[in-house]
Each structure stands twice: as C-alpha cells, then as structure tokens.
Amino acid sequence: MKVMAASFGLAGLGMTGCRCPEQVILPYSKQPENVIPGVPIYYTTSQPGDRDNVPVIVETQSGRPIKVEGNPSYSPYGGATSVYTQASILDLYDPDRASKSSISETAVRDRLSAINKTHLADGGKGLVFLAEPSTSPSRAKLVAQIKESFPEATWAEYAAIDQSTSEKAAKLISGKSLRSIPDFSKAKRILSLDADFLLNADASIGLARDFVKTRKVKDSKDSGKMSRLYSVESSLTSTGSMADHRLRLSSSQMGAFIAQIGAALGLSLPAAVKYAAASLDIDAKWVKECAADLAANKNHALIIAGEHLPQSVHAIVIAINEALSAPINYIEVSNAESGISEAVARLNEGDVKTLVILGGNPVYNAPVDFDWATAQAKAGESIYFGTDKNETAKAASLMVAASHYLETWGDGRTFDGTLVPVQPMIEPLFPTFNELEVLARIAGVGTTDAYSIVQATFTEQGGGDFNKFLSDGLLEGSNSKTVKLTSVDLSVIDASELTAPALSASKLEVRFTASSHTGDGRYANNGWMMECPDPMTKLTWDNAIMISPRLAKEL
C-alpha cells in the first residue's frame, strides 16, 4: 500500500508549478469563468503509438491532467483503452524522467539548426536517423522534406517489438503493403496462430470488443451462434485461455503447421512449401478437423498470426484467408524503406558525421547481432531525443529531453487510418522539446511551431473546422479506404522459414516476448504497471523465464 500511495503521490498530487498551455487553453493568470475548483474539465487527445494512436479523453482538475479514458466518439474502440494508456499519465509526473537536455534550450535549438547547414553541403551523406515508427502525417511531411533536402541521408525506423511483418508479407506476395483489419464480430470460426490478439496486438482493444460480441450466450438457443476459437500457441496467453480448442506448439513449428492447414484446405502450394509441411509430426486429426471447420464456415472464418512469425507464415495465412473469403478488410500503408540493419551498416562505414536517434532505446533492446552500442560510438556526433535518461541517452554525445504526449501538439492515425489530434493538457513541466520542432529545425522549414505545423497538415488534408477536430478528438470519415487484394503469389516466399526444427531438452527454442508490465521496457519505471498482475502468471514487480514442469525436471 505504501508503494501504491507513492505512485498516487507522484501522479500530480504533490506536484507544484503545473501550468496550462499558452495556446488555445487559457492560462491561470486570471480564473476563467468556466473553471470551478473541484469540477473537472475534459479534453480530447490521443496516445501516440507505433501503428495506432489511441483516441482518449483526459480529465483535468485546475489545469492538471489526472485521468485518461477512451474517447467514445471513436466507435471501433467504444470508449475503451488499454492498461498502458491508463497508466501513461503516471509517466507525465515521473520524477525520474528527463527533465532537461544536456545543454541549454537555446543551445539545443542552435545545434539542431546547425545540422541543417552542415549537411546541406554534402547532401546528407554523413547524416543518419534512427526513429521509432509513427502514425503522424505531420512527421511524415517533415521526413519527406528532410529526404528532399538531404537525398544522401539515411532515414531508418526501428521498433523493439515489430508489428509490421504481415504488412511486409502482403507486399512480398501482392506488390502492395497492406494492413489487414479483421472483423471478429462477423467471424464464426477463428484460428489464432501464436497471436495474443485479445491483449498484445495492435488494435487489440477493438479486436477484443468485437470478439466478445460473438461469445455471448443468453440461453440454449444461442449456443449455435457462438463463435469457435482454435488457438495454436507456444505459451499460455489470454487468447489461449479463451480458446475452445488449444494446441501447444513451438513458434518455430508454426510455419509447417499452417502449411499443413493450407494443404488440408486444398490450397495450391509450391512444392517447397509442401516439403516443409511434412517436416512436422503432429496430430493429423487436429489439423484435419480444424481445416474442415474453417472450410465449412466460408465467409465467416479467419486466421490471424502473431507478428513475430516469419513473412512466409503470414503469406500463407493471407492466401488461406483469401480462399476462405474471410471477413477482413485491407488498407494500404507505408513502411520505412530502411531499418536498423541499414543504419548499422552506414555507421560501420565510419563516415557518419551526425546520428539522430528519435525515441526508443536501441543500446538496450536492439538485436545483439547488430552491436548497436559500438556502431553508435562510430558516429562523429550522436543526438538522442527521448523522455528517459536510458542507456542510449547516456551513450549519446547530446541528449535532447522530449515532452510527454500530454504536454505537446501533434497528430496521428488510428489503426484503421482515422486522423486524430495530439493536444497538450498542460504546459511542459520541464524545458523539453516536441519531436516536430526537432525535425522542423533539422529540415530548415519556415516554422518550427508544432501547433502551426499540425494545423497546416490538417488544412492540407482538407480537414475543415480545426477547432471541431480538436473538440471531437478525431476527423469523422477520415479512415483509410479499403482496397482489394488482387493477387497472391506464394512462389516468391522463402519456404525454408517454414521447416520445423526438431526440438528437445538439448535443443531449445527461446522466445523473448513483450512484458505485460513494461511492454518493450519503456514502462519499467511506471509503478502502476508494475503493480498490475500478469494476466496468466499473476506476477507483479517481477519477471520470469517460463518453462514446462517436465523440462524443468530434465534440466
């Protein structure tokens, strides 16, 4: 209880000097007529994510944000949020967050502007960016301007938990980078392939909401209407705990399994894929009956796969879903052409003058094969922009403190492409910076004011009334238009990814998964998240290696 009390104490209850933003929301130099002490005022904004900005409504008391809830105006989520969104407000008041940059505010602005002048001469040949993925159209516009000004620069994006494998697989077999948006409210039969879509997936808020609609049984007459969930997974998850039929299988064997499902459904598979399917010795009856059930519910059956699985697995899943006429919509998305591997390659060449890292913590969570810490040290200058004084910040030559999303202007898109604003609830508690300002100064554009940049982007996209956009918390009807998957070519996939290895106590498969407490590590200092029990193990304030009792005895 003492720890929880400490969490509440630092969540704004003991903070002083809290100020409202100077733009749009009135400052408290004089008591506004519509503000009554003890009566909350609500504002809309959204929590930025790699691929999904979550629309929220924030409760404020006397200028201080104190509670985050979902925005009911966004119908796919129905006013719901994730536990991460609920706890994100605590990070605003975290006394351990980066409260200032390693140099003065003026010096930071001068240094960012100097990057523009320095690299205009070499076309950006010595300039490398490593950024976390973002849905912001304003950031995308600034990135395009940076690429135009510095054609030789490298723009790479990296997320410790990559959720874009299915989109890359779609591009591989169809030529278009497509995001699948399943409609579980129309699905009667579901096969989940190592995918915890009820908890740890993009848009899991909406997916879970649609799924439970098909699981409600009021009396015996409704039993036939209830959906059926098949779950094949490597560890027990929230999704697996809800399954009607569950099969335990290692992640590395999922490729051979889905190839067997495809063959059982009569899908035309390349010879190499059929060969890979034969590499897995599994209960043939389970595969046969699962495939038959999916086929019997054509138009109302779908398969979803975990994003950690190889592209070849997702390619077969896409092909099967097309054959089943699954209730899935596709929207076209854009992914960065370069990733962390390209950034490391450029750094190892030894001629990078300036490295700009926007968020994340690659020194801590980049794959060990890349040895990011060594590569980062090879840059003439490394600039880290982020909210935490983490391992990457400490290894950088310059640290630029970032504002919390409740302190800043921005924009973004939800998982289905709906445009949403990011607006401040409070003036920055510390002398921190906005990502849009950082990029604008490097790009050398006319204005570096984030509010003006966001408003201009909104106008360019034909948004209409900007104030209504801020009030509603979204632009109605701005979701991405669905597209058809016109062709699927499985001959281009790497069938070797599908071959199932022989596993034993002496040849183990190890999976690193996202923590229910800390995500990819960014919530490690969030007391609320650490207090929240893991849905399966019930662990709090801890982590564990999960192995079976049998393996534990053998080891």
Positions of the model-derived regions?
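Short acidic (Asp/Glu) and glycine-rich catalytic loops that position anionic groups and cofactors
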Residues: 236-242, 268-269, 296-300, 326-329, ...
